[in-house]
Regions:
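C-terminal hydrophobic helical "lid"/dimerization subdomain
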Residues: 173, 319-371
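Mid-domain Rossmann-like dinucleotide-binding core that forms the NAD(H)/NADP(H) cofactor-binding site
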Residues: 162-238
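Short amphipathic alpha-helix with an adjacent loop that forms part of the alpha/beta core around
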Residues: 237-247
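Glycine-rich beta-strand-centered segment in the early N-terminal region that forms part
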Residues: 43-61, 74-123
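N-terminal Rossmann-like NAD(P) cofactor-binding module of classical short-chain dehydrogenase/reductase
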Residues: 115, 252-253
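Glycine-rich phosphate-binding loop and adjacent beta-alpha segment
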Residues: 206-208, 259-336, 368-371
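NAD(P)H dinucleotide-binding glycine-rich loop of Rossmann-like/cofactor-binding domains
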Residues: 84, 92, 117-190
């Protein structure tokens, strides 16, 4: 099959690369190309395969976390480091079709469509790592432990499915852990991010009072997608939110603590909950002059947290039950995420550029491996 990869032109012969393209991601040149991948062998008689399945990736998408991995791989290739590989695959969300099953697999069948189950932090099987299932969804073929995928319903299309797992599992966990009351006022920061979008849509489905904070202009269609949430725009790089009339909230969801934590804390009510699942500057090249990452307000922040009995919660992905719940609540008429663009394998640069360089992007960019 044809698969998209970051390619090392110093190590991979030109004849092995089709549709070579270059794009810039925050100052790093990333070279993408299409390579041939053969179906891996899978011996169902081998006991080592008993609890595993072989999956053909039908479509995949990238998350913010993949950006740093892509940039790091490209930097290694560009600097000709000895540890650089000929190709580097990427992508952590996918939908795939099971093509082979091991003898010990009972709940999954050949032909089933599945998505990754990134359960964390609790182990479900000895020797099977928790957390993100793969960083190489673009490889096209994946051999995975049976616990690391879940089947999806027919009414979830491939494009939503390829964008679903990490955002849905993370948002489901964050909402569960905040013990939200029906009267709580909720703020979601960086609201165009994929995780924030999942959070907003899930909260609205339950009837909560949601305010979404953004630094971008939204179209009417985009505002309609999150209605009746109140969308408030602030200037990008604003050092303090004191000059805007935000008010107070009982719960604040924030995907980027290094950008927003210091400004969030003063806007929490007594016994308020702040929860975060990540940070923006996962690589030094991601840092911008307008980022407010001051540490000299830390003492004031902790004083406010102590005086007001605040809860500061860190969240990493979620449990299997969190993902099962998100799948069970999925409504094709009210999807939790928009699909911004769908491209095929021969549009690798467009896929990466749209995913990471377009501030106007609203939702996920999906690459399909289906004809």
């Amino acid at each position: 099959m044809k698969a998209l990869a970051i390619v090392n032109t110093e190590l991979l012969p030109e004849e092995c690369i089709k549709n070579k393209e270059e794009i810039d991601i925050l100052g790093t040149t990333v070279t993408s190309g299409v390579v041939d991948i053969t179906k891996p062998s899978f011996d169902i008689k081998n006991p080592q395969n008993d609890d595993f399945v072989l999956i053909h990736v039908d479509a995949f998408s990238c998350n913010y976390r993949d950006k740093a991995l892509i940039v790091k791989a490209a930097i290694k290739m560009n600097s000709k480091e000895t540890s650089a590989r000929p190709v580097s695959f990427f992508g952590s969300d996918f939908v795939g079709t099971i093509t082979e099953v091991g003898a010990g697999v009972t709940d999954l069948k050949i032909g089933m469509r599945v998505i990754p189950n990134c359960y964390y932090p609790y182990k479900e099987y000895e020797g099977v790592a928790t957390g993100v299932v793969t960083n190489e969804a673009s490889k096209g073929w994946l051999k995975l432990h049976k616990s690391k995928v879940l089947a999806i319903p027919d009414y979830m299309n491939d494009y939503v499915a390829a964008s679903f797992s990490i955002g849905a599992q993370t948002s489901s966990s964050m909402i569960r852990r905040c013990n939200i009351k029906s009267t709580d006022k909720i703020l979601v920061t960086s609201s165009r991010s994929n995780t924030s979008m999942f959070i907003i849509k899930s909260l609205l489905t339950e009837g909560y009072d949601v305010t979404a904070l953004t630094t971008t202009d939204w179209s009417k269609e985009e505002l309609d997608f999150v209605f009746p949430a109140k969308v408030i725009k602030i200037e990008r790089g604003l050092k303090s939110w004191e000059e805007i009339d935000l008010g107070k909230f009982d719960v604040i969801f924030d995907p980027f603590y290094d950008l927003n934590l210091l400004n969030c804390i003063p806007h929490l009510n007594f016994n308020g909950r702040y929860i975060t699942c990540g940070f923006k500057n996962q690589h030094s090249s991601f840092e911008e002059k307008m980022d407010d990452v001051r540490s000299n307000k830390f003492n004031l922040l902790m004083l406010q947290a102590m005086i007001n009995n605040l809860y500061i919660i860190g969240n990493c992905i979620g449990t299997t039950e969190d993902l099962r719940l998100a799948i069970s609540k999925y409504n094709p008429n009210n999807t939790p995420i928009q699909i911004d663009k769908i491209v095929d394998v021969y549009h690798g640069a467009e896929f990466l550029d749209s995913t990471y360089n377009m501030q106007s992007r609203f939702g996920k960019v999906v690459m399909t491996y289906k004809d």
